Curated annotation (Swiss-Prot):
GO cellular component, one term: plasma membrane
BP terms from Gene Ontology: polysaccharide biosynthetic process
Main location: membrane
Protein name: Succinoglycan biosynthesis protein ExoM
InterPro entries found in the cross-reference section: Glyco_trans_2-like (IPR001173), Nucleotide-diphossugar_trans (IPR029044)
Amino acid sequence: MPNETLHIDIGVCTYRRPELAETLRSLAAMNVPERARLRVIVADNDAEPSARALVEGLRPEMPFDILYVHCPHSNISIARNCCLDNSTGDFLAFLDDDETVSGDWLTRLLETARTTGAAAVLGPVRAHYGPTAPRWMRSGDFHSTLPVWAKGEIRTGYTCNALLRRDAASLLGRRFKLSLGKSGGEDTDFFTGMHCAGGTIAFSPEAWVHEPVPENRASLAWLAKRRFRSGQTHGRLLAEKAHGLRQAWNIALAGAKSGFCATAAVLCFPSAARRNRFALRAVLHAGVISGLLGLKEIEQYGAREVTSA
């Protein structure tokens, strides 16, 4: 086993993003793990095969194979499932199409997978802010991504920096829900289901990827929309397991948390970073209530996100 060649696929879902070129170039420049054979799967989610020319133009620069797959309909779950369906490797990594990887990114993810035996490994995402980003956003680092621990374990995850062990029992046949492909939250749902099926999720703290924060995302309004949608996903997952009095309790608890955080935001008014962090938590818990009540989820993928997706 240690001396066998590992086959690793890297899935990149894309939708009209020229930044994909830098993502692919960063993969070409990274250190390849020992005894590993790599392949990149680019899943183009645009109605037209708009990324094909970019991928074909970069193909001569790539030290490993690229599989371009056109999977239209502007539904991110279709693109993610396309990567799953076309993966033949021992592992499948996921990366966003506006990110660049550090030199040892894949090596670190693979080391953690080997030492922990986890079904999935997550890495951190470091946000890079432009000069027009508010000071509170930079100081509070509101856009970087890390996993969340609950009672000492990671119970859900994200696809912006992840490695999946394809033969893990908790992942066999698992797919991203098409119903969440425009609203988002499909990755939270995917990893939550994997964890509930017995799959463990590990964290590789040195497996860094880097993500620029475009100007249209460097606002409190954009973050609030994102947090509300995240809350909706969490509320929907809670609603699937709770009914009657338990459902009422969850709604009351989310309301209390939202109220507490809103009050804390007012009390922290002099500190913009603390004030906005509490305000965003209040919005998240309001989203949980929305999800518990089954209200329509915000759409964040597809034509409405052309300039920022």
